[in-house]
Amino acid sequence: PNIARATALLRPRGVPVVAADSDHTLPFADATFDLVVSRHPLATCWPEIARVLRPGGGYLSQQVGPASVGELTEYFLGPQPAAVRGRRHPDGARDAARAAGLEVVDLRMETLHTEFRDVGAVVYFLRKVIWIVPGFTVERYRGRLAELHERIRTTGPFTARTTRFLIEARRPQ
């Protein structure tokens, strides 16, 4: 859905939005761009980014970090394996960027708190962010939702940590 939304927003402003094809190949010649940006990519194809950047060109991206809103996932699905909780760690992005021949200029991660003050907000969120609890429906999780409603009513907001990281990389001259 993000490509369609970005296109609808940016095309009227004269900004083309281009998505990689299924094999992550970007439809551009080598050394085409001074800057490549992305926000919340599903996957970062570092070799392709390095290929399309001109020498000295940069890549800037904000990405979802590890275990983002993991508390919410685990509330509905139970404990997740360490391999799942550790996915999308900025150290992995740094290593992959370097392996593609890029220099990492800056890498920083922030952890924020997301508070759900009522169960309706949880339902809305899980319907929009479908990968947090795959296959989520009110019917399937009615019991857990009722328990969560009671928990929020008696103890206050359900809080989940949200992690994001910013990475800036540069193709050497």
Model-derived features: positions:
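A short glycine-rich, Lys/Arg-flanked "PGG" loop and its adjoining helix->strand segment in the class I
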Residues: T44-L60
